[in-house]
Swiss-Prot record:
Species whose genome carries this gene: Cyanophora paradoxa
Identification of the protein by name: Geranylgeranyl diphosphate synthase
Taxonomic lineage from the root: Eukaryota, Glaucocystophyceae, Cyanophoraceae, Cyanophora
Localization in the cell: Plastid, Cyanelle
GO BP annotations, alphabetical order: carotenoid biosynthetic process; chlorophyll biosynthetic process; geranylgeranyl diphosphate biosynthetic process; photosynthesis
Keywords: Carotenoid biosynthesis, Chlorophyll biosynthesis, Cyanelle, Isoprene biosynthesis, Magnesium, Metal-binding, Photosynthesis, Plastid, Transferase
Gene that this sequence comes from: crtE
Amino acid sequence: MKPLQTNFNLLTYLYERKEIVEDTLNKSIPRGNPTFIYDSIRYSLSAGGKRIRPILCLASCELAGGTMEMALPTACALEMIHTMSLIHDDLPAMDNDSYRRGKPTNHIIYGEDLAILAGDALLAYAFEFIATQTKNVPADLIVKVIAQVAHSVTTSGLVGGQIIDLSSEGKSDTTLETLNFIHIHKTGALLEAAVLSGALLAGAKEKDMNRFLRYAQNIGLAFQIIDDVLDIISTEEKLGKSIGKDLKTQKATYPSFWGVEESIKQAELLVEEAKEEILYFDNKAIPLIAIADFIVNRNN
């Protein structure tokens, strides 16, 4: 295999796509009445963040032969769903967090009732946005994408992971197998949906979809391992959210099983496996390869 190009600038790539995603998100939900629910929705949706899920969706679509325009509605929908999950995650009945993306959490500003409804609305808006805004993609592929994204939120995805996460809190007998289950579903499912939906929109073949799947599964788990590490070694200012909470609530984490250094090694191994899956695409894979490296080397 010929060597991959080395002049790719990941920071520029991430910045440009983040700007496109945020511009589209800002226009995606126009203000209406009652205004305060829109204020609550937009407070969290415009709070920043890495926008890694939408960027993965755009990158996989382009790698599979599609265009950014084809994938942009789904990319933004994924960010709406991710934002919904953060709003609901932060509620007192869930993780009870008061600080997210460098700001007070949604329910601290708008109350628990509006926070719940804002999350509900974002979930519905996400699927409406895919269905009404996706252009130049066959209808059968749009249906497949909607099914893929929806599945990532069900009890086989994000919800299932959150349920086991909540029920494991404070227990000293949580196994590594259970921890993997939690994060394959709670964190990994939406990252997986981002990669797969982008490829689906471009009409990727089944053998290529399997490569995208294995790439996504590996980076999803690596992402969570590094999140657990950062909760120990980073600062609240860098992360933009509360730190040390896992330790306080006696929640099982990868460092609690392996320690910090071994956790980082395991994440690096997963990223190498992810990259191996898409080297098949040669230079077209460079953005996804660089994003995989970013996931394990990030500091927030």
